[in-house]
Amino acid sequence: MAKYILSCCSTADLSKEHFDKIDVKYICFHYELDGVEHPDDLGQTMPFEEFYRKMTEGAATKTSQVNSDEYYDFWKPYLEQGSDILHLTLSSGISGSVNSANIAREDLEEEFPDRKLYVVDSLGASSGYGLIMDTLAGMRDEGRSIDELHDWIEQHKLDLNHWFFSTDLTFYIRGGRISKTAGTVGTILGICPLLNMDDEGRLIPRSKIRGKKKVIQEIVKRMEENAQDGLDYSGKCYISQSACMEDAEAVARLVEERFPKLDGKVEINYIGTTIGSHTGPGTVALFFWGKRRQG
């Protein structure tokens, strides 16, 4: 079987140590903080705590996706050494990264006609996207071929459920996703929006929950309703959080209590600087395998 590598973007929001452990390569998005560009490199250049503190203090943020030249330079050495590549991009519902990746893929396929270079739109984000990569790495380690992985993930990527809530509406207002009036009222009333990712990889508001305790209960209820095998779910569960570890840990405890057959403890990661530039602090995201996503 031909050797191959798995790769993704840094927006899969796993730690560098996790990516190294499962041998998945990643390419970095970019973000600006008060006009200064930084790589979204999993908190290595700027610790996540510092990033979110600066956002809270009013720093302006802006993000940029990986361009086609960067993809080209990232993949070419692996093709030169004789490896095939399966790359998953951040969801096309929130980023145009897949288009840049496909431009680079077409150029490289002309240069390396004997190599396979698959580009797949993950339709996922943050550590949900990361859980997909972790699952594929496990399949690779079992001896499955690149073609088997490609076909499997195209069939099953919508089975990876993404649920999010936020307890801080500041950056939703600043980014125009919530009107200033609605945001002000929501803040006064303690409203926490509950969102999920649909079958086109877009973030869709589903409910407005009053109070942190209630929204924590509600997001776990959504897992109960949608997880593969219900309360007998035996897969992995990941959580991402943006400078609200206590809330993330509260969700994790509840998940571990309700789902005793989980594959290991719930893994909690930071929401990285690209996605975090849009959510700001106060967001918790829950990821698990389950019912196929709908619109």
Language-model features: where?
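Mixed-charge interfacial surface used for oligomerization/domain docking
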Residues: 3, 11-19, 24-30, 97, ...
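N-terminal glycine-rich anion-binding loop in soluble enzyme alpha/beta folds
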Residues: 5-65, 70
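Short beta-strand/turn micro-motifs composed of small residues
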Residues: 8, 89, 241
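Positions that flank functional sites
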Residues: 34, 93, 201
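Alpha-helix N-cap/helix-start motif at coil-to-helix transitions, marked by capping-box chemistry
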Residues: 42-45, 95, 126-127
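A short glycine/small-residue-enriched secondary-structure motif
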Residues: 45-52, 75, 80, 107
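Glycine-rich phosphate- or other oxyanion-binding loops that anchor nucleotides, phosphorylated ligands
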Residues: 56-92, 99, 103, 150
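Short beta-strand->loop
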Residues: 89-91, 120-123
